[in-house]
Amino acid sequence: MLSEQQYRYIVRILGTDIPGDLKVPYGLALVKGIGVNLAYALCRLLGIDPNKRIGFLTDAEIEKIEKAMANPLAIGIPVWMLNRRKDYETGKDLHLVGADLIYYVKRDIEREKRIRSWRGIRHALGLKVRGQRTATTGRIGMTIGVRKGKK
């Protein structure tokens, strides 16, 4: 084990503070846009032990992770693991993390609303978008109790 001085209680990766006591894949999964499967793939391709704690990562390893997430295809991440394939504007395969992901999703929803597609209309009305039933579930607002009638 490394000495106490080399352990960090909080590690900042891709703009997210991660507790140092988590294992690398589960710590990386706290970054918006990275799931556990992608984190395990990153560990395997970058040669980082997945059982290692995030707090024991060196600066070089953290930099490797950040560079890999900037261009995941370059290190061998398969295209199907990316979260934005065939981007609407550029046509490129991208993987977005953090604030970029939030911004692009919000922009996509606004575009759907603007072109008045079915999805956009559902978003605008605050209804379910993906074909779920709405008769009994997904009700919003205060619940009103049923009052018992007089006997």
Curated annotation (Swiss-Prot):
Alphabetically ordered keywords of this record: Ribonucleoprotein, Ribosomal protein, RNA-binding, rRNA-binding
GO cellular component, one term: small ribosomal subunit
Signal peptide: none
MF term (GO), any: structural constituent of ribosome
Family matches, as Pfam families: Ribosomal_S13
Family the UniProt entry places it in: Belongs to the universal ribosomal protein uS13 family.
Assembly and binders: Part of the 30S ribosomal subunit. Forms a loose heterodimer with protein S19. Forms two bridges to the 50S subunit in the 70S ribosome.
Protein purpose: Located at the top of the head of the 30S subunit, it contacts several helices of the 16S rRNA. In the 70S ribosome it contacts the 23S rRNA (bridge B1a) and protein L5 of the 50S subunit (bridge B1b), connecting the 2 subunits; these bridges are implicated in subunit movement.
Name of the protein this chain belongs to: Small ribosomal subunit protein uS13
Organism: Hyperthermus butylicus (strain DSM 5456 / JCM 9403 / PLM1-5)
Gene responsible for this protein: rps13
